[in-house]
C-alpha cells in the first residue's frame, strides 16, 4: 500500500509528513540524512481532502502547528515505525523525555537497563523516522553537547531553544 504525504511549512523548513491509513509513519526535514525527500519515492501519493491517511495527516499537521506555536508540548497521534524491538524500546523511551528537558545517550541506555548500550541507543536514535513527535532532538552528549541529528545541528539547537531546554554545551 502506498504511503500518503503532505507538506508542512515550519520555522525549521518545510517538513514532509507520511502516513498509512492508520498511523503517521514519517517526518522528514528538508536536510534529512535518510535519503531523498519521500515525495520522490515510487508509489507515494499526495494527501487529498478525505480518506483515512488524510485524516491522520490533518491531525499530525494540526498538532505540529500547535507545537511550533508553543501551545502543545505532547503529541497524541497513532504512530507506525519500522524497526527492531530494541529500536522500538528506544523510541518509546524518547517519548517519555519531557518537553523542555534533555537527557544523554548514556542515561537513556541506563534507563533501558544496559549502561553499556550507549552506542546502540545512539544508532537507534538516529534511525527514528518520526522526529519531533518522537523527540530524538532531546538527546545530547554526555557533557551536554549537541550531537548528530537528521535535521542538522542547527535544527536541533532551534528545537531545544524553542522548547526552553537548558543545556550546557561541552567544551
Residue ranges and their predicted role:
Residues 142-171:
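…primarily DNA-binding HTH/wHTH and HhH modules…
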Residues 15, 139-141:
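Active-site and channel-lining beta-strand-loop segments
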Residues 132-139:
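Short Lys/Arg-enriched helix C-cap and helix-to-coil transition segments
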Residues 118-121:
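Helix-turn-helix DNA-binding helix
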Residues 1-116, 162, 166-171:
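Basic nucleic-acid-binding alpha-helical/helix-turn surface characteristic of O6-alkylguanine DNA
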Residues 126-131:
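Terminal helix-turn-helix DNA-binding modules in bacterial transcription factors
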Amino acid at each position: 500500500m502506498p504511503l500518503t504525504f503532505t507538506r508542512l511549512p515550519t520555522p525549521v523548513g518545510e517538513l514532509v509528513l507520511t502516513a498509512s491509513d492508520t498511523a503517521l509513519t514519517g517526518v522528514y526535514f528538508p536536510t534529512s540524512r535518510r535519503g531523498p525527500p519521500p515525495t520522490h519515492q515510487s508509489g507515494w501519493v499526495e494527501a487529498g481532502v478525505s480518506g483515512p491517511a488524510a485524516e491522520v495527516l490533518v491531525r499530525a499537521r494540526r498538532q505540529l502547528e500547535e507545537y511550533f506555536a508553543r501551545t502543545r508540548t505532547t503529541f497524541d497521534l497513532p504512530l507506525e515505525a519500522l524497526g527492531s524491538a530494541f529500536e522500538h524500546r528506544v523510541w518509546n523511551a524518547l517519548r517519555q523525555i519531557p518537553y523542555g528537558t534533555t537527557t544523554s545517550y548514556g542515561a537513556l541506555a541506563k534507563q533501558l537497563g544496559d549502561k553499556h548500550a550507549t552506542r546502540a541507543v545512539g544508532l537507534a536514535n538516529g534511525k527514528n523516522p518520526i522526529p519531533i513527535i518522537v523527540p530524538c532532538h532531546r538527546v545530547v552528549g554526555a557533557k551536554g553537547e549537541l550531537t548528530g541529528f537528521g535535521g542538522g545541528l542547527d535544527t536541533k539547537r532551534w528545537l531545544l531553544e524553542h522548547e526552553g531546554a537548558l543545556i550546557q554545551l561541552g567544551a
